[in-house]
Amino acid sequence: MDALKRYDPEVFAAIQQEVERQQRNIELIASENFVPKAVLEAAGTVLTNKYAEGYPGRRYYGGCEYVDIVENIARERLKAAFGAEHVNVQPHSGANANTAVYFAFLQPGDTVLGMNLAQGGHLTHGSPVNFSGRTYNFVPYGLDPETERINMDQVAELARQHRPKLIVAGYSAYPRVLDFKRFREIAEEVGAILMVDMAHFAGLAATGYYPNPVEHAHVVTTTTHKTLRGPRGGAILCKKEFAKEIDKAVFPGMQGGPLMHIIAAKAVAFKQLSDPDYRAYCGQVVKNAKALAQALLERGYRLVTGGTDNHLMLVDLRPKGITGRDAEHLLDRVSITVNKNAIPNDPEKPMVTSGIRIGTPAMTTRGMKEAEMVQIADLIDRAITHRNDEAELDRIRAEVHELTARFPLYAD
């Protein structure tokens, strides 16, 4: 980055500080990961100079013969990884992908079933503060109060009662496997389209460590970062019968020119999906999550649903007498990065919360395994237990830096 350093030292300095933060911190935000250097390089290419409205072979600009090659590579790799009939790799984000699906199949005011944000859903699944909840009539489904798992009987009952045009299955903070077969049966019963938002678990689904929603859903959306370990972006996978509607909804419906440099980075990331090393990585993500969850349980923490089937867990901090916001700030002081997160029926405000969400994808990318997860649980517990002891917090921070130094980011 010599040119950047010379031309804009202020921005360069901020980027370098972020590099250092990523290197020294234990990154436990479930939606974050570290992309391979090849993905970084692809995202920083001259493809950012090229406008390419339209699709390969059908562009509104000349000079697209090489970006067509790149987009086709990305499409074919994603299709192969999930066994999809059609894909669109142009959405700029997961939110844009969800928006495009709604735009393709719904009219303003149409009824949709989506998971309640307060119980693990996503903003774009019908939150009243989001465009989705303001544009469409979202009916929220939630969790069984006893098991804290999705109440599929409630989903079926709400579907029969409200006859939604679309049912959304997916989450941002739910640690268990979704029953895609049951969701599809409910959708068929009421004549609804089933959309699965697999943003969080896409990498696990591509490698057999989570059910593949493409087998049951009419349409699937995803981000391309998180467990896919690619650039920030989105994608849509669907049945061939919906290809025209989806493509028209993305362009010209929701977006103009695609980000061809990011599509190149997506293509590189999708190449991982057929790599045995990546499959082993996804398996380790799940093993690490189970190990970290068990270690926290053994230290007296309550986990929503009692554990995890995927890459994340939701920790209820009320028994420890600390809010999610305060825990996030506390752990940040010792170089452990988490995010505050509401727990089911959380009595605290959304910017305070009673819990934190923890995920294992990022530190698994750096090579950590079960033993390190136990160590991380111990560091978290010691920080929370001794949160008013500055000397102990200093010792914990030093131990964190010693641990991360053993697993360097971009070692070469």
Swiss-Prot record:
Catalytic reaction(s) noted: (6R)-5,10-methylene-5,6,7,8-tetrahydrofolate + glycine + H2O = (6S)-5,6,7,8-tetrahydrofolate + L-serine
GO (cellular component) term, any one: cytosol
Residue numbers carrying N6-(pyridoxal phosphate)lysine: K226
Keywords: Amino-acid biosynthesis, Cytoplasm, One-carbon metabolism, Pyridoxal phosphate, Transferase
One biological process term in Gene Ontology: glycine biosynthetic process from serine
Site (Plays an important role in substrate specificity): H225
Coiled-coil intervals, chain numbering: none
GO terms of molecular function: glycine hydroxymethyltransferase activity; pyridoxal phosphate binding
EC number: 2.1.2.1
InterPro entries: PyrdxlP-dep_Trfase (IPR015424), PyrdxlP-dep_Trfase_major (IPR015421), PyrdxlP-dep_Trfase_small (IPR015422), Ser_HO-MeTrfase (IPR001085), Ser_HO-MeTrfase-like (IPR049943), Ser_HO-MeTrfase_PLP_BS (IPR019798), SHMT-like_dom (IPR039429)
Pathway noted in the entry: One-carbon metabolism; tetrahydrofolate interconversion; Amino-acid biosynthesis; glycine biosynthesis; glycine from L-serine: step 1/1
The protein's enzyme class: transferase
Predominant location category: cytoplasm
Leader sequence segment: none
PROSITE patterns assigned: SHMT
Top-rank lineage group of the source organism: Bacteria
Task performed by this protein: Catalyzes the reversible interconversion of serine and glycine with tetrahydrofolate (THF) serving as the one-carbon carrier. This reaction serves as the major source of one-carbon groups required for the biosynthesis of purines, thymidylate, methionine, and other important biomolecules. Also exhibits THF-independent aldolase activity toward beta-hydroxyamino acids, producing glycine and aldehydes, via a retro-aldol mechanism.
Family to which the UniProt record says this protein belongs: Belongs to the SHMT family.
NCBIfam families: PRK00011.1 (NF000586)
Quaternary structure (record): Homodimer.
Protein name: Serine hydroxymethyltransferase
Species in which this protein is naturally found: Symbiobacterium thermophilum (strain DSM 24528 / JCM 14929 / IAM 14863 / T)
Upper classification of the organism: Bacteria, Bacillati, Bacillota, Clostridia, Eubacteriales
